[in-house]
Amino acid sequence: PQRLRPLIPEIRARMSELLGEAVEVVRARFGGRLSYASVPLDGVDWGPFDIIATDAGYRTAAMAARFGDDIRAFVAQGKAQGKPVAVTEFGCAAFRGAADMANRGDIVEWGDGARPVGFKGEYVRDEEEQARYIRELLDVFESEGVDNVFVYTFARYDLAYRSASEDFDLASAGLVQVIQGGRGQRYPDMRWEPKAAFHALAEFYRALDASQR
């Protein structure tokens, strides 16, 4: 909101102070590399960190035209500071139109206990759209030189497939379809079934690995 804009500099300063203190505490106990999954509003001072990271890896229809430029600028930020960069969150759900909405695609009506009870409209399951979106973004990240990426997410156990009329998984960004009260076909000992996005991710990295040998 507009009324909060004057507070942003103070919020960012306090955020950086808090993160700096947190880094000191963690480094006293942990010898590995550190990062923080940020959003643009945070305005993080990356000095204390080893990896520059963002959760803002989503491409919506509203900003698709500038998405490549945004990722290029993010990579340039890392190069300027001599640090690798990571996109710590990207993906979309498995319904038609989800790619345009990306992380803004909450189509579920929630009931008591954070339990899905219905949808906000009529939606059609479309695993190929989810898979295509992930492939397209992986191509962008790879071509622009992003060092590490993390798909959101492997599974949403709160958005399980119950029946054809209660297919809440179509609203899930999970790479697998969680099956309530059942087991998968490909992996019968698991409560989930790989979606098209699962295979798209595997195929991308299989091909990338082969090209780098």
Question: What is each of the regions a protein language model found here?
Answer:
Residues A13, E17, A65, D69, ...:
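Generic alpha-helical secondary structure signal
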Residues G121-R125, A131:
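A conserved mid-domain beta-alpha-beta active-site/ligand-binding segment of alpha/beta enzyme cores
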Residues E129-R132, V140, E144, F150-R213:
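Aromatic-rich peripheral "rim/lid" segments of glycoside hydrolase catalytic domains that contact
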Residues P1-E21, V25, V39, A99-D100, ...:
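Polysaccharide-binding and catalytic clefts of secreted carbohydrate-active enzymes
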Residues P9, A13, E21-E24, A28, ...:
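Glycoside hydrolase catalytic-domain groove-lining segments
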